[in-house]
Regions:
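Glycine-rich phosphate-binding loop
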Residues: 57-96
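Glycine/charged-rich beta-loop-alpha catalytic/anionic-binding loops adjacent to active sites
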Residues: 11-12, 38-40, 89, 112-120
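Short, glycine-/small-residue-rich phosphate/pyrophosphate-handling segment
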Residues: 100-148
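Glycine-rich phosphate/diphosphate-binding loop of Rossmann-like nucleotide-binding domains
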Residues: 8-49
Length: 181
C-alpha cells in the first residue's frame, strides 16, 4: 500500500466506541492518526443497544477500505470482541474506565480474555493513543513511507528520554547512575 497513490479521504482506520461518553478517550487515537495524516472514520456503535448496526459496520468495513478497527468500550466492553468475531480485519480494543466500572477491570478483562480464534489486540485502560500507534504500525507493514515516519517518531521518543536523563544528571551529578545511556 502506498498512501501517496491512495484517495486521501478514504478512511483506512475505523475508530468506534460504545457511547459518545467514550469520545474523550477515543479522541486520543484520532489525534495520533491525524498527526501522521492517516484518514479515519469515527462513530458510535453500541454492541448492546445497536447490535444490527454493529454487525453491519463489521461486515462492510473491509469493502469500504478500512484496514484496522480501533474499538473502545467501558463496562462489559463487548464491542471489540464482537467486531473481531464478525470481520477479518485486525481489531484493537481500548478498555475504557466508565462510571459504572469496577476500576476498569471489567473492561480490561472483557477485551483481554477473548476465546481462541477471535483475537483482539488490547492496549492499556484508556490507552487510545497507543491504539492509534498500533494501528499505524499495522498499516506501516505495507507502507514504507509510513514506516519511515514511525522510525522518526521512535527516534524522537529516544531523544526526549535522553533529554530527561541529562536533566536528572544535571540535578544530581554525584548521585546519578552510571548505566550506559
Amino acid at each position: 500500500m502506498n498512501t501517496k497513490n491512495m484517495d486521501a479521504t478514504k478512511p483506512l482506520v475505523g475508530i468506534i466506541m460504545g457511547s459518545d461518553s467514550d469520545l474523550s478517550v477515543m479522541k486520543q487515537a484520532a489525534d495520533v492518526l491525524q498527526q501522521f495524516s492517516i484518514p479515519f472514520e469515527l462513530t458510535v456503535v453500541s454492541a448492546h443497544r445497536t447490535p444490527q448496526r454493529m454487525m453491519e459496520y463489521a461486515g462492510t468495513a473491509a469493502a469500504r477500505g478500512i484496514k484496522v478497527i480501533i474499538a473502545g468500550a467501558g463496562g462489559a466492553a463487548h464491542l471489540p470482541g464482537m467486531i473481531a468475531s464478525s470481520c477479518i480485519l485486525p481489531v484493537i480494543g481500548v478498555p475504557i474506565l466508565s462510571s459504572n466500572s469496577i476500576d476498569g477491570w471489567d473492561s480490561v478483562l472483557s477485551i483481554l480474555q477473548m476465546p481462541s480464534g477471535v483475537p483482539v489486540a488490547t492496549v492499556a485502560l484508556n490507552g487510545a493513543s497507543n491504539a492509534g500507534l498500533l494501528a499505524l504500525q499495522i498499516l506501516a507493514t505495507s507502507d514504507t513511507s509510513l514506516s519511515a515516519k514511525l522510525a522518526i517518531h521512535k527516534k524522537e521518543l529516544q531523544s526526549k528520554v535522553a533529554d530527561k536523563i541529562k536533566g536528572l544528571k544535571d540535578l544530581y551529578p554525584n548521585d546519578f547512575d552510571q548505566a550506559p545511556h
